[in-house]
């Protein structure tokens, strides 16, 4: 039987990975570590698809980590994620449990599964001024020139692209100090969802979250003093809803552009996961359409080495 340190459940948005991970954690009597770059923020719930009800299975709450750990407006980064992951990972292991890592932020997943050596990167005002007038497309092209941790998966606003370039520039001239990060042997399960079904679920989920008050959530965040620029930085829902709230888009424009952006995001997530396979990760894909019991049985078989 392979000696795994953890189980990773990954997949694009709307693939059902969170209820799958929760059901698996319930079966194995363990806890979940989230790998979602936006669900770490408190009060950003509907816009990040933070379905906390998914973490209750048959009336039993499943303990989860790295959700609701930072205030809106804060620029949390992958260096901090590595640090916080390790604290959560070690606390779960000390209980004698096999942690379940679950999420769709490829850079977060890969940073801990591969143990990238990272360090905090200060702001570079001169570089920011130089890049300020570039479009997102131009910045994405600049970013492609680096041998980089980043791809365009989460770089969907000008500010995020500039920050990604800032990090790459800093790493180019500052050698990364040796920092111990444990080599983790993870069983990696990917949730494979048919493209048309994924698109249908994305649209349905978007309409549902809007009905549940996603616009009000963004208004509430701005009323709490979070600047529109900071919300736009988080991309996707927060970018387009903020543009609607401040009057830059009509409701119809917001919906159409946001729907398209989420579809594109899911496609980029799958591109990242396929890239992980090319970079040496073994991902065991399971159909999103299988009944939950069959998905769990699939993982148990893989844990046994079958």
From Swiss-Prot:
GO terms for molecular function: ATP binding; tRNA dimethylallyltransferase activity. Residues 36-39 are annotated as: Interaction with substrate tRNA. Its cofactor is Mg(2+). It is an enzyme of class 2 (transferase). It comes from the Bacteria. GO terms for biological process: tRNA modification. Its EC number is 2.5.1.75. The keyword Magnesium applies. NCBIfam families: miaA. Monomer. This is tRNA dimethylallyltransferase 2. The lineage of its organism: Bacteria, Pseudomonadati, Bacteroidota, Bacteroidia, Bacteroidales. The gene is miaA2.
């Amino acid at each position: 039987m392979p000696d795994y340190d953890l189980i990773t459940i990954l997949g694009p948005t709307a693939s059902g990975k969170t209820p799958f991970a929760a059901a698996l954690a319930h079966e194995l009597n363990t806890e979940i570590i989230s790998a979602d770059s936006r669900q770490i923020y408190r009060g950003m719930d509907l816009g990040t698809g933070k379905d906390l009800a998914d973490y209750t299975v048959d009336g039993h709450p499943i303990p989860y980590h790295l959700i609701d750990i930072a205030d809106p407006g804060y620029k949390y980064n992958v260096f901090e994620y590595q640090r916080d992951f390790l604290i959560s990972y070690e606390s779960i292991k000390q209980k004698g449990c096999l942690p379940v890592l679950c999420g769709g932020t490829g850079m977060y997943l890969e940073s801990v599964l591969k143990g990238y050596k990272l360090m905090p990167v200060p702001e570079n005002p001169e570089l920011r001024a130089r890049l300020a007038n570039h479009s997102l497309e131009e910045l994405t092209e600049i970013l492609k020139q680096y041998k980089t941790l980043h791809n365009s998966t989460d770089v969907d606003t000008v500010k995020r692209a500039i920050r990604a370039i800032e990090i790459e520039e800093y790493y180019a001239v500052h050698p990364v100090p040796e920092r111990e990060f444990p080599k983790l042997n993870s069983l990696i399960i990917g949730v494979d969802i048919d493209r048309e079904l994924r698109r249908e679920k994305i649209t349905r989920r978007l309409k549902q979250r809007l009905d549940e008050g996603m616009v009000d959530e963004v208004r509430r965040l701005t009323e709490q003093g979070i600047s529109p620029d900071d919300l736009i930085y988080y991309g996707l829902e927060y970018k387009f809803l903020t543009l609607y709230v401040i009057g830059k888009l009509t409701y119809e424009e917001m919906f159409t552009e946001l729907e398209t952006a989420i579809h594109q995001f899911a496609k980029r997530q799958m591109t990242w996961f396929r890239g992980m396979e090319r970079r040496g990760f073994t991902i065991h894909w399971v159909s999103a359409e299988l009944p939950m019991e069959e998905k769990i049985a699939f993982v148990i078989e893989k844990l046994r080495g079958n």
